[in-house]
A protein has these predicted regions:
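His/Asp/Glu-rich mid-to-C-terminal helical/loop segments that flank catalytic regions of hydrolases
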Residues: 21-22, 87-105, 133-137, 180-189, ...
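Long, well-ordered mid-to-C-terminal structural blocks that present hydrophobic/aromatic surfaces
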Residues: 187-250
Length: 348
């Protein structure tokens, strides 16, 4: 038995990328990185990150402006692959909607925007600092109240804990230059987010998606917007990244892409899968579900370097992955362990 431990799986797949082509000698690989007990995974999506960088300058804040901070919080967030079909609200998108509306009607000036963190998580919090002419202050606050009420009604079934707050700020000295503000806000509103296509090969499986992961001011001259695209079809993954690039390029950003990673094409005739299903049925008296997942597993990279490998992936039940609410269902751990031990006894 060989044991393969990798580093940096959550943020960059560095360990899997650096795996040598002559390190493994086995013909079977059992990946222990899945999140639903009772389900055996035999395929996954490939992924790529698309990063937009806006170069900006700060200008002196105009006179007679009142400044505010808007916060969006308490969204569910979740994994940007496995949870992308659940309709989770994106905090970056939500803040951008308010800014866009303010630009149309109230001569809004943006000073700061911060939202999201991990590239592979649906962002659950974001905030922005901005100003409107003091003569529009009371009218803007009324518009905000209507906007917040509309959002709470819009999100009430999918985000019951959603919060949006508006607080007046002390005087702000600087605001973003007008060109960058326009490009940033319009692209955040316009860029696709969520499910792009469902799979025709495996009904119920998301084929292609994109996630507006984070918006960060970096240094004193850059705003970096990080997005991630996933697909079980390589050409669709590339096209999704081109779609995202096009929106940000039109908005004046410099756009780059990560190296990306391949998907894992299912092999329903795998001997290892046959052994795994038989072991599960013997141990627990029911057949496991066999499916693919719309998330990035290292298996695609392993298969690229070891094309002869037969692979399955399973694990105990996890929820809220890649969010502060991540948790493990302890009762599923013994079943996970017993299944692994039984499979290892049977493989040759």
């Amino acid at each position: 038995v060989e044991a393969l431990f990798t580093v940096d799986e959550e943020t960059g797949l560095t360990g899997a990328f650096e795996l040598g082509e002559e390190m493994l000698t086995g013909k079977y690989l059992i990946n222990l990185d899945s999140e639903d007990e009772g389900e055996i995974f035999i395929g996954c999506a490939g992924g790529i990150d698309t990063i937009a960088t806006f170069r900006y300058t700060m200008e002196e804040a105009p006179k007679n402006y009142s400044f505010f901070r808007v916060d969006v919080s308490d969204l569910q967030g979740g994994h940007s692959g496995d949870d992308i079909d659940k309709g989770r609200v994106n905090s970056n998108k939500t803040v951008a909607r308010l800014l866009w509306d303010g630009m149309q009607s109230f001569e809004l000036k943006l000073s700061y925007f911060n939202g999201g963190n991990l590239r592979n998580a649906i962002p659950r919090e974001a905030y922005a600092i901005f100003g409107v002419p003091t003569r529009f202050k009371s009218e803007f606050v009324k518009r905000y109240d209507l906007f917040a009420a509309d959002l709470k009604a819009e999100f009430r079934f999918r985000e019951p804990n959603f919060k949006i707050t508006l607080n007046e700020m002390p005087e702000v000295d600087q605001v973003l230059d007008a060109r960058t503000q326009f490009g940033l806000v319009y692209s955040l509103v316009g860029v696709p987010n969520g499910v792009i296509a469902m799979s025709f090969a495996m009904p119920g499986l998301v084929e292609t998606s994109t996630n507006l992961a984070s918006v960060k001011f970096e240094g004193d001259d850059r705003i970096v917007v990080t997005t991630s695209q996933r697909s079980s079809v390589e050409s669709a993954k590339v096209y999704a990244s081109q779609m995202i690039e096009s929106v940000f390029a039109l908005a004046g950003a410099e756009v780059s892409h990560s190296e990306g990673y391949p998907g894992w094409a299912p092999n329903p005739q795998s001997k290892l899968l046959e052994i795994t299903v038989a072991s599960y049925e013997k141990l627990f008296g029911v057949k496991p579900k066999v499916r693919a997942i719309h998330a990035g597993l290292e298996c695609g990279l392993f298969l690229e370097k070891y094309p002869h490998l037969e692979m399955v992936s399973f694990g105990p039940t996890l929820r809220g992955v890649h969010s502060p609410d991540e948790r493990l269902e302890i009762a599923t751990v013994p079943k996970f362990w017993d299944l692994l031990a039984d499979i290892l006894k049977k493989v040759e």
